[in-house]
Amino acid sequence: MTPVALDIAIHLAKIALIFFVVLTLAAYLVFAERRILAWIQDRKGPNRVGPFGLLQPLADLIKLLTKEDFRPAGADKWLFYLAPAMAAIPAILTFAVIPFGAPLTLFGREVPLQVADLNVGLLFFLALSSIAVYGVALGGWASNSKYALLGSIRGLAQLISYELSMGLSLVPTVMLAGSLRLSDIVAAQEGIWFIVYQPLAFVIFLISIAAECKRIPFDIPEAEGELVAGFHTEYSGMRFGLFFVGEYINIIVLGGLATTFFLGGWHGPWLPPFVWFSAKTLAFAFFFIWMRGTLPRLRYDQLMHLGWKVLTPLALVNILVTGWILMLR
């Protein structure tokens, strides 16, 4: 096999592995959430399909595939069908720039456990997170439903508001690492994780990604008591499943990014690097599930106040303080 063919084969293998692992994790994250919420609420949860209910994600997939693909009268056909894909695909693509382990040596060459080591990896992530907003907007607009439209308007306002604080909270990590490349940011945390230097940025980022995931207490776009199911009210079958899976993939991806920027990525003692990265990422996923089971929903005005009058000003002040400290060094 020629070197070029070998490089292509290695890249395709990494893409296939990430695609399989992320989709499997998303499916079982749904199962884990149902079991954890059941434990919080003092009940059993799904335990009938397979041993300990472990085949429940497969049963859910079969149910979604066999549901009727319903489209409301008056809906914009092509935008209605495009929206679920635009919500799910950017989340998967973001994983391309996340380093999930130390480089391996295969066939006499060093292979990074990362699909694309871009020198603008942070900008790539921010760009894809902006594209995902269009899935929410198109899903509500194309459905010809007042509930869906109101949900998409709320979703747009929320995502745009918290993308700003999320992006600003990452600027100090770039200042400390001196690079936008995610592998360089991980390498800069080999001794001390950035959460030690930037606890405020970490808290701002954590709150912002919870809002980006549209999870309780930030599930304003999908508020069941007000908007039925928000921007995906009119979706059924696998198209609803794409919105659903996209949400859980987003949880995994944003947990991986929080690990990369603040918790040292795959760095850690004793255990293999990939195990460390996975454990940290799944800890964030558990945190999101715990929030859903224990916190109430914010009002819309409280949501906007927190984003624009608290998190964004704090992130700007943190950037100024970090720059001032770096100048004095």
Curated annotation (Swiss-Prot):
GO cellular component, one term: plasma membrane
Compartments, record wording: Cell inner membrane
Record field: transmembrane: 12-32, 78-98, 120-140, 159-179, 191-211, 242-262, 270-290, 308-328
Membrane topology: Multi-pass membrane protein
Entry keyword annotation includes Cell inner membrane: yes
Keywords on record: Cell inner membrane, Cell membrane, Membrane, NAD, Quinone, Translocase, Transmembrane, Transmembrane helix, Ubiquinone
GO BP of this protein: aerobic respiration
A Pfam family matched in the record: NADHdh
EC id: 7.1.1.-
Function: NDH-1 shuttles electrons from NADH, via FMN and iron-sulfur (Fe-S) centers, to quinones in the respiratory chain. The immediate electron acceptor for the enzyme in this species is believed to be ubiquinone. Couples the redox reaction to proton translocation (for every two electrons transferred, four hydrogen ions are translocated across the cytoplasmic membrane), and thus conserves the redox energy in a proton gradient. This subunit may bind ubiquinone.
Protein family according to the UniProt entry: Belongs to the complex I subunit 1 family.
Name of protein: NADH-quinone oxidoreductase subunit H 1
Species of the source: Geobacter metallireducens (strain ATCC 53774 / DSM 7210 / GS-15)
